[in-house]
């Protein structure tokens, strides 16, 4: 590690079974961490010398490692001893997260999923939970961060993880803006769909019919519609409100679709204008026109108007 490079962030994630470890690790992975579950901590020093297995991970990327009482060779005392030793390295920043939860809530979760607690054998889940809590107590006392998930929903825990460990690691939301023709069906995976069929239709102007929403004359025609400016501004402002919120909530992908009858004029023009406005605001949307070159869409538009 050079003198200027930051130490690699290592987050050890443990806690009571059913308290949310899997959700925490998945959230961290969505945030750009390399996540590994059920890893024997005694092998941690060897793992740190291994190159990342994922092509998207850079050497030194933050790493989240999950382990619990089921992990092979689980031993709280040895884990604490090893981590204390590794924490002395200047190239590592190791944090331990412990996920806790009230016993009654854990019982409810086990009953709801109809799963048996691994330490309860033929006894009630409460017995296994109590034994596990006693075994984990040294780790709970030693952990840097304790999150109690008793009253949490899955979304609550995801947000708590982002708030606690987001820091400078912010994976931007991938934004796709598309145009389409309703006559060919709606895009099945769009998050937001805007219907542009209220705007004046260039299809009915002979000179504009063979052109598309990417041509200047078509754009000028659509802009003359008294409703265009206000509609554009309201849609733009709504997206500028929503997109940062989506990113804060960890939404990886947002697909914004604009539709008109054939998908060649009004929807194309609005999609182009909104994409340009979002780029000016600092976003990097990908722009797709599904039916732009479709002769069939043009024929259908002539039928439906």
UniProtKB/Swiss-Prot annotation:
Signal peptide: none annotated. The keyword ATP-binding applies. This is Nucleotide-binding protein Saro_2904. InterPro entries: P-loop_NTPase (IPR027417), RapZ-like (IPR005337), RapZ-like_N (IPR053930), RapZ_C (IPR053931). It holds the Pfam family PapZ_C. GTP binds at residues 68-71. Belongs to the RapZ-like family. It comes from Novosphingobium aromaticivorans (strain ATCC 700278 / DSM 12444 / CCUG 56034 / CIP 105152 / NBRC 16084 / F199). One of its GO terms (molecular function) is ATP binding. It comes from the Bacteria. Keywords: ATP-binding, GTP-binding, Nucleotide-binding. Displays ATPase and GTPase activities.
